[in-house]
């Protein structure tokens, strides 16, 4: 792949996995309330993906690194609607609307050149500069994602009580709750993957969901932020019917819900609530003071669980779309 052409006073140089930590530093500097983990970034920048094409760049100004840029899209054979995702960030000292505009222009050119028909971009809902830049470029708001934070100190007794109640209910209903580390089924990863694919199809979205290969799912299970003894699953006999996982950043960041899902056959039976209660009770035992989670604004069942657990809403995100 050729480097993207320079725009404005910025230049774009193809990035390597070793540049991922710098990208994490940039995102952390822009949004210190949501630190990003360099080890996690580098791991994921190092991984292939069977169904996606990625292009990443270090953005320079006068030869100095000031940011990064990304252009990615699913392989068109798995997503014929041809959505292309563009993004990037700049250090706060260099972060202007004009320079963000230059990043978007360069990345849009790249994905459109690859055949994208609809452009997608993301902004935190309190990021005025990025939002104004996207609107000027013709993007329209598509969907909102809600973000929540749970104070584990203030809600400790309530959460432990909910955990105990859920354990009792699951026991009566024949649902076994355990960690991935405690499960001895050699096919457990495949079962969790199949469950997650089923649940993923039910998450509200505008962009068609791209199937996730089992190899990608296995890489996630082995990622540095994931611990098998903190990875909770629900079983009914041989079937895996639920999963909930908190990610623990190795270097910096807030512990965050990576994924919660249940099979269609057990929804409304308290399985998701039981799993989420186990994850936060374990976090309390590990000395974590708060956890965060995010969900599509239209995902009412999970939003309701968040509210009952004591999560408080914090600034979320907005997905923007623009036809080519």
Label the model's feature ranges.
Residues 47-51, 222-227:
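Short loop/turn motifs at secondary-structure junctions and domain boundaries
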Residues 16-20, 27-126, 236, 240-263, ...:
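Conserved donor-binding loop and adjoining core beta-sheet/short helix segment
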Residues 1-5, 92-185, 318-322:
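Acyl-donor-binding surface of acyltransferase catalytic domains
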Residues 96-109, 262, 268-281, 304, ...:
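Conserved acetyl-CoA-binding loop-helix of GNAT-fold acetyltransferases
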Residues 241-260, 268-278, 282-292:
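Extended hydrophobic/aromatic segments used for targeting, binding, or gating
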Residues 1-44, 52, 165-211:
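Short amphipathic alpha-helix that is part of the acyltransferase structural core
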Residues 23, 107, 130, 192, ...:
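Aromatic/hydrophobic pocket-lining residues that form π-stacking "cages" and hydrophobic walls in ligand
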């Amino acid at each position: 792949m050729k480097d993207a052409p320079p725009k404005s006073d910025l230049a774009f140089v193809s990035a390597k996995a070793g540049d991922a930590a710098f990208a994490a530093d940039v995102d952390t500097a822009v949004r210190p309330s949501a630190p990003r983990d360099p080890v996690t970034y580098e791991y994921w920048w190092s991984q292939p993906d069977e169904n996606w094409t990625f292009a990443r760049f270090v953005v320079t100004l006068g030869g100095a690194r000031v940011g990064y840029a990304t252009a990615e899209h699913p392989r068109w054979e798995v997503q014929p609607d041809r959505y292309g995702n563009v993004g990037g960030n700049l250090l706060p000292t260099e972060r202007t609307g004009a320079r963000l505009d230059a990043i978007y222009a360069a990345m849009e050119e790249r994905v459109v050149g690859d055949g994208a028909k609809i452009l997608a971009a993301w902004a935190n809902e309190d990021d005025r500069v990025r939002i104004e830049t996207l609107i000027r470029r013709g993007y329209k708001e598509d969907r909102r994602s809600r973000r929540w934070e749970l104070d584990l100190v203030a809600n400790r007794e309530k959460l432990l009580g909910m955990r105990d109640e859920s354990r009792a209910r699951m026991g009566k209903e024949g649902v076994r709750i355990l960690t991935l580390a405690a499960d001895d089924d050699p096919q457990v990863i495949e079962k969790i993957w199949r469950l997650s694919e089923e649940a993923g199809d039910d998450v509200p979205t505008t962009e068609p969901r791209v199937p996730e290969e089992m190899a990608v799912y296995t890489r996630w299970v082995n990622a540095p932020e994931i611990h098998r003894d903190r990875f909770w699953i629900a079983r009914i006999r041989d079937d895996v019917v639920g999963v909930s996982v908190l990610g623990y950043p190795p270097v910096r960041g807030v512990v965050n819900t990576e994924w919660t899902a249940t099979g269609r056959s057990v929804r409304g039976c308290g399985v998701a609530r039981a799993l989420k209660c186990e994850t936060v009770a374990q976090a309390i035992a590990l000395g974590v003071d708060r956890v965060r989670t995010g969900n599509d604004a239209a995902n009412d069942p999970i939003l309701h669980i968040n509210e009952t657990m004591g999560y408080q809403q914090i600034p979320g995100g907005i997905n923007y779309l623009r036809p080519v």
